[in-house]
Amino acid sequence: MKSFLFAGIVVVLTVAAVDTLRCIQCNSLKDSCVAKNATECPSNATTSCTSFSTNFYHGEHPTWYEDHACSEENCSNTTVESFTVSVSENETFHFESQCCLGEPCNQTSNTTASPHQVGSGNMECPACYGNNETSCNETRKCYGERCVSIIAEFTNETKTLVLKGCSNVSISTCESLGAGNQTFRGVTFRKFECGDNFSTTTPLATTDTGSQASFTPLALASILLLSLLL
């Protein structure tokens, strides 16, 4: 009888060990993520691993940010989202995220944003970033699939970030974030609009799909961008 009981305990412990999720867990604002090893996830976040990164290219000095974590999000399979917002010839933002179900994500690509071509592009978009819409009204000709206009507010902060530019962001991302008033890790997006060839942003039709953690890097990046404005 004792042998059966011992065998049952071994089976339970083996299953528990197999089910334990290990993810890379770090935030580059707090500590280095370089060569970071995966560690066991807390009991309240054992479904997926997530990886978020962004860089801001301004001249020859890119600013890099990344965040890796455990998550309860069921992303159904490994998903990767990335897009770029070009503000000027020398100012470009690149955003990238991964959600990996039941396994660690690959390290983010460390892609450095580079400036989009300007001058004879087939798009004309508002392109700037600032603390409010009145301080953000420049336009530029550029290459890209669509124009974007983003307004983000920050919990426990009085600052608002306005970001506009040319972007290769997908329609699905526009629709996911375009419902408005979506909050991600202390950042509320009051507006995320996409359109084509306009000087006054007109939103694409959107559907309310709720908060999606796979797009969180944009929120995290916005915190980084806010620090650039202070």
From Swiss-Prot:
Its main location: membrane. It is found in: Cell membrane; Secreted. Residues 212-230 form a propeptide. Residues 1-20 form the signal peptide. One of its GO terms (cellular component) is side of membrane. GO terms for biological process: defense response to Gram-negative bacterium. Secreted protein specifically required to prevent invasion of Gram-negative bacteria in the inner mucus layer of the colon epithelium, a portion of the large intestine which is free of commensal microbiota. Prevents invasion of flagellated microbiota by binding to the flagellum of bacteria, such as P.mirabilis, thereby inhibiting bacterial motility in the intestinal lumen. Segregation of intestinal bacteria and epithelial cells in the colon is required to preserve intestinal homeostasis. It is a lipid-anchor; GPI-anchor. Keywords: Cell membrane, Glycoprotein, GPI-anchor, Lipoprotein, Membrane, Secreted, Signal. Gene3D superfamilies: CD59. Residues 125-172 form the UPAR/Ly6 domain. Glycans are attached at residues 37, 44, 74, 77, 90, 106, 110, 132, 137, 156, 168, 181, 197. The keyword Transport does not apply. Belongs to the CNF-like-inhibitor family. InterPro entries: CNF-like_PLA2_Inhibitor (IPR050918), LY6_UPA_recep-like (IPR016054), Snake_toxin-like_sf (IPR045860). It comes from the Eukaryota. This is Ly6/PLAUR domain-containing protein 8. A lipid is attached at residue 211 (GPI-anchor amidated serine). Highly N-glycosylated. Not O-glycosylated. GPI-anchored. The GPI-anchor is cleaved, leading to secretion into the colonic lumen. CDD domains: TFP_LU_ECD_LYPD8_rpt1, TFP_LU_ECD_LYPD8_rpt2. The keyword Lipoprotein applies. Disulfide bonds: none annotated.
